[in-house]
Regions:
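Beta-lactam-recognizing serine transpeptidase/beta-lactamase-like catalytic domain environment
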Residues: 167, 171-221, 226-478, 488
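Periplasmic/cell-envelope proteins involved in peptidoglycan metabolism and beta-lactam response
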Residues: 1-194, 204-221, 239-240, 295-303, ...
Length: 506
């Protein structure tokens, strides 16, 4: 009898062990796969509201997303809160029981919800000890103080600011205007959520889209950083002479390229690449584009991470480009075959118009590569995942994207960009005691009478012995308050100056 009881006991223990193992597997190891089933998406989001979701935290320790317990709601035990919602909306995204997740909330969902394999030990311990399941915390690269400075500097002007550490690709700040409050989409009231969603989607300013990384714009003269790099990489120098006419006649057409204000570039009958860059002379850079050719321009743009496209299809990249955890509309530049037999488009593309498209994140990466001796890092937004008790369980190290230009070309480009700020179109970015390198841009778009976008891209400190620690790109749409009279030097450069000044001296 005792033997039978012992066998029965062993059998029951084994069965309970198998049952426990299966439950543990489902709750710990298979949760992510089950959550990924589209049929379970809505059900899974509601189920996640029973878990205390992890926090999203800036590099300097500011909590920008957290979960708080609700009262009297058996289904939604927690609600998501964003203490400075509009300021960080482009980073956090939203977490909504109706409309799902976006940005970091989506990209890092398995960690935030506690379902990632790296959190298996923590989740299993909670299960064994009868503690409620908790999500992990996501540590971002964002500098909360600099984010506030960038937002204040941009003000209510529609546009965006991106700041990057060139050494590792860390996104220090990423702001966009107009923005939205993710708290409106993350409440317990589904009717209020839907009303906010309809209002936001009906807004012609599209506040749910980030100008920093979601949209694309003509880069204008900031693209001359790429055209100049192509020239330097192909044997030309900063002092190479170029014919200096009043305007450039485009081959096979009656059209011309003119400099800003119809002026002639300084230098006399001939001028140099350096002078043309410092004064942003369209005529000379049209010549440079024609001289180096479509292949060299396309190769250089694509090396900087611009997506190769074959117009009129401008939607799909023809090869993988920059990796980023949240949605990123990488820059666009046509394949060389697009320009075959069409030299005018080569000249126009060399000055950042036609099918050239970019956003502040893309252009900040270009500046970062120049600042970093020609080596471009992948943009990094998340550095660590921590378990609910604060222990680091996963790290995301910096990753090199590529070497779009040589160190020698980067050194020449740095000197040229320093001259833009010291004596050219970017003097509004000067900071006492600091050497700043930059490039202005005034990008035409739309039809006649449409105000241009104002650009400024820069990095600092940029002295001969300095190691640059910040690169900034600013766009102000439609010239901001100056409208059709705006230039990048007038409108965007002062914004970038405030960001760099705050980061390096404030």
């Amino acid at each position: 009898m005792n033997r039978r009881i012992r066998r029965l006991g062993i059998g029951l223990v084994a069965l309970f062990g198998l049952l426990f193992a299966q439950v543990s597997y489902i709750q710990v190891f298979a949760a992510g796969r089950i959550a990924g089933d589209p049929a379970n998406a809505r059900r899974q989001i509601i189920a996640e509201y029973k878990v205390e979701r992890g926090q999203i935290i800036t590099a300097d320790g500011t909590v920008i997303a957290l979960s708080e317990p609700t009262s009297g709601n058996a289904t939604l035990k927690y609600v998501r809160r964003y203490p400075e919602g509009p300021l960080f909306a482009g980073v956090t995204g939203y977490y909504s029981q109706v409309y799902g997740r976006t940005e970091v909330e989506q990209a890092m969902n398995s960690y935030l919800s506690g379902d990632a394999p790296e959190l298996a030990v923590s989740t299993l311990a909670d299960l064994v000890l009868g503690r409620p399941k908790k999500g992990g915390h996501v540590i971002t690269t964002i500098d909360a103080r600099l984010q506030r400075v960038a937002s204040d500097a941009l003000g209510t002007s529609p546009g965006a600011v991106v700041a990057i550490d060139p050494r590792n690709g860390d996104i220090l700040a990423m702001v966009s205007d107009p923005t939205f409050d993710p708290n409106e989409l993350s409440s317990q009231d589904t009717d209020a959520i839907r009303a906010a969603w309809e209002r936001l989607n009906a807004d012609p300013r599209t506040p749910l889209l980030s100008r920093a990384n979601d949209e694309l714009f003509p880069p204008g003269s900031t693209f001359k950083m790429i055209t100049a790099s192509a020239a330097l990489e192909n044997g030309y120098g900063s002092s190479s002479p170029w014919p200096n006419p009043h305007e450039l006649d485009l081959p096979l057409t009656t059209e011309t390229i003119q400099n800003f204000g119809g002026e002639t570039c300084p230098g006399g009958a001939t001028t140099t690449l350096l002078t043309a860059f410092v004064h942003s002379c369209n005529v000379i850079f049209g010549e440079v584009g024609l001289e180096v050719g479509a292949q060299a321009l396309a190769d250089q743009a694509h090396a900087f991470g611009f997506c190769p496209i074959d117009p009129p299809d401008e939607t799909g990249c023809l090869q993988p480009t920059i990796q980023f955890p949240i949605p990123f509309a990488t820059g666009r530049f046509p394949v060389s075959g697009y320009f075959e037999g069409n030299d005018p488009l080569v000249a126009i593309s060399a000055i950042g118009q036609d099918n050239d498209l970019a956003n502040p994140l893309q252009m900040a990466l270009v500046a970062s590569a120049i600042a970093n001796d020609g080596e471009m890092m992948n943009p990094r937004l998340v550095t660590q995942i921590r378990d609910p008790r604060g222990r680091v369980i996963k790290e995301f190290p910096p990753r090199v994207y590529g070497q779009p230009i040589s160190a020698s070309t980067a050194a020449v480009m740095r000197t040229m960009m320093v001259d833009v700020v010291s004596s050219g179109t970017g003097t509004a970015a000067q900071i006492p005691g600091l050497v700043v390198a930059g490039k202005t841009g005034t990008a035409q778009h739309g039809g006649p009478g449409t105000a241009p976008h104002a650009w400024f891209v820069c990095f600092a400190p940029a002295g001969p012995d300095d190691i640059p620690t910040i690169a900034v790109a600013v766009i102000v749409l439609d010239g901001g308050s100056l409208g059709s009279e705006a230039t990048g030097g007038q409108v965007a450069a002062p914004i970038a100056k405030q960001v760099i000044d705050a980061y390096l001296t404030g």
